[in-house]
Regions:
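Extreme N-terminal signal-anchor transmembrane helix of membrane signaling/transducer proteins, especially
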Residues: 1-17, 21, 256, 260
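Extracytoplasmic/periplasmic sensory segments of membrane signal-transduction proteins
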Residues: 21-120
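Short, hydrophobic beta-strand elements of compact beta-sandwich sensory domains
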Residues: 147-164, 213-256
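Conserved beta-strands of PAS-like sensory domains
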Residues: 102-104, 109-120, 138-173, 191, ...
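Cytosolic-side ends of inner-membrane transmembrane helices, especially those
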Residues: 258-273
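Short hydrophobic alpha-helical segments used for membrane anchoring or interfacial signaling
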Residues: 90-97, 179-190
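Membrane-proximal, non-catalytic sensory/regulatory domains of signal-transducing membrane proteins
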Residues: 121-150, 178-181, 186-187, 196-232
Length: 274
């Protein structure tokens, strides 16, 4: 009986450790994808930042200079996007006069470009109030992950559409309740990676590696140093117990049979003694 009890407890602990290890591995895969996106954005922004002369001509040059510089800058941006499959498009806006300078945006409408440019200007206004330089969020009719670089009077934004962001690994592969959240440095959820569940979107979450809600929910979080984003995997108690229930019933039956056999054996020994 004691051996069976020990086996039951150890099996549960091993299952829990296995699930946590699985979640941790999945979080690390998410993080590699995030880092890959932001590395691509960095490379693209660095390339465009080397064209400040062209941007200056667009902002302050003659009409002819502006046209020439815009064409050359667009060529450079298009090369950056085409050569980098991680990015959907890149956009440059002049923050001083709030003009959209150029956009390498295959398959993106003019209205979306304008919405993104407006978003950049709003971010610059927020930065004056002490906000950080790098941003990532959802905007417009489609969701985007954005990384933005600002010169003195211009801004570059490299974007990745949500439907290509973390699309190949989602929590739908964990149908028994596991969920993954993407949060910013303030703990605000910017994407729920469990398909069809939006209960956490936009909410501020306490993310820490500890037991929550009377040991009913485990939250494991990992931060990307490059992107400043947190990936958090959550495991509910049902996630453990659902897989464990079949084994538990089987072990319980074995324990009952073992106890019954012991009782019969003790009864037989008692009769033999007397």
């Amino acid at each position: 009986i004691w051996l069976l009890t020990a086996y039951t407890v150890s099996s549960f602990l091993l299952l829990k450790e296995s699930e946590e290890s699985s979640v941790w591995s999945t979080i690390q895969i998410y993080m590699k994808q995030i880092d890959s996106k932001f590395i691509a954005m960095d490379q693209c922004v660095e390339g465009i930042a080397g064209n400040q002369d062209l941007i200056g001509q667009i902002c302050y040059g003659s009409p002819a200079d502006r046209y020439y510089a815009a064409v050359e800058l667009q060529k450079s941006m298009k090369r950056d996007v085409i050569s980098n499959t991680e990015l959907d498009y890149v956009l440059i806006a002049e923050s001083l006069n709030k003009n959209l300078i150029a956009a390498s945006t295959p398959g993106v409408s003019y209205g979306e470009k304008e919405a993104i440019a407006s978003y950049i200007w709003n971010l610059m206004e927020k930065e004056d109030r002490g906000r950080p330089q790098w941003y990532y969020t959802k905007i417009g009719t489609h969701a985007y992950i954005a990384k933005i670089y600002r010169g003195s009077n211009w801004s570059v934004a490299a974007f990745s559409k949500e439907n290509t962001f973390l699309s190949d690994i989602r929590a739908k592969e964990y149908p028994d309740g596991q969920s993954f959240l993407l949060t910013d440095a303030n703990g605000v959820c910017v994407e729920n990676l469990e398909e069809g569940n939006s209960m956490y979107l936009g909410e501020t979450l306490e993310i820490e590696d500890s037991w929550k809600n009377d040991h009913k929910k485990r939250m494991i979080s990992l931060k990307s140093d490059r992107a400043g984003l947190y990936i958090t995997g959550m495991i509910g108690s049902n996630h453990f117990l659902g897989k464990f229930s079949t084994n538990s019933i089987l072990i319980l039956l074995i324990m009952v049979l073992a106890i019954g056999c012991d009782m019969i054996l003790l009864h037989y020994i008692h009769r033999e003694i007397h």
